[in-house]
From Swiss-Prot:
Active site: C79, H186, E188
Subunit structure and binding partners: Heterodimer of HisH and HisF.
Lineage of source species: Bacteria, Bacillati, Bacillota, Bacilli, Bacillales
Name the UniProt record assigns to this protein: Imidazole glycerol phosphate synthase subunit HisH
Keyword annotations: Amino-acid biosynthesis, Cytoplasm, Glutamine amidotransferase, Histidine biosynthesis, Hydrolase, Lyase
EC code(s) of this entry: 4.3.2.10, 3.5.1.2
Gene: hisH
Family matches, as InterPro entries: Class_I_gatase-like, GATASE, Imidazole-glycPsynth_HisH
GO biological process entries: L-histidine biosynthetic process
Main location: cytoplasm
Residues in Glutamine amidotransferase type-1 domain copies: 1-211
């Protein structure tokens, strides 16, 4: 069973519907006691990093997530949920994240080196470019996936970046280390590629994919 963490800022409906299409059992909960029964976790997210971390800390979910990961439970962060996995974000002032992966979340510049402006938020379909092999990307094609974001991750740990996309800057699109994974894009809105990634994550949870 997959536990979808409900902290009031997630795209719960689309994620749960994707899991239903794949016929995977799931629960949606804000209760660590219920979520503890899940074999793997999904941390969705839409909105402000600062607000999300405040809620996660106030509800005890931040502590629960970190403890679950340390105990070996697989975790997948989606969009803002992926950003929350990292050390900190500069959105609305510097805010400490979950610190499960090394890196900082910064704003997409919106201006090229030549001074030309481009649209932020980054909204639409962009192509994946694979960087490192991962069970999360097994039998996944380097096709287009759907992004909606104004911030992106910068990290000195190149091994964490499993796949990138480009929006004037290189955007870590899929990240992973140990039992912690994340996608900056929305797999549940990314057609066959996104569904395959969710399917691979479920296989990781079931122990069919190597971590």
């Amino acid at each position: 069973m997959i536990g979808i963490i409900d902290y009031g800022m997630g795209n719960l409906y689309s994620v749960s519907k994707a899991l239903e299409r794949l016929r995977y059992e799931y629960i949606i909960s804000d209760d660590p006691k219920e979520l503890k029964n899940a074999k793997g976790l999904i941390l969705p997210g839409v909105g402000s990093f600062k607000d999300a971390m405040h809620i996660l800390r106030e509800t005890g979910l931040a502590k629960f997530v970190c403890e679950a990961v340390n105990e070996g439970t697989p975790l997948l962060g989606i969009c803002l949920g992926m950003q929350l996995l990292f050390d900190e974000s500069e959105e609305n002032g510097l805010t400490e994240g979950l610190g499960l992966l090394s890196g900082r979340v910064v704003r997409i510049p919106g201006v090229t080196a030549d001074g030309n402006r481009y649209k932020v938020p980054h909204m639409g379909w962009n192509r994946l470019v694979f960087r490192h092999p991962s069970p999360l990307l097994q039998n996944v094609e380097e096709g287009h996936v759907y992004f909606v974001h104004s911030y992106y991750v910068v990290t000195d740990d190149d091994d964490v970046v499993l796949a990138s996309s480009f929006y004037n800057v290189e955007v870590p699109a899929v990240v992973g280390k140990g039992n912690v994974y994340g996608t900056q894009f929305h797999p549940e809105k990314s057609g066959e590629i996104g569904m395959k990634i969710l399917q691979n994550y479920a296989s990781i949870i079931e122990g069919k994919g190597s971590m």
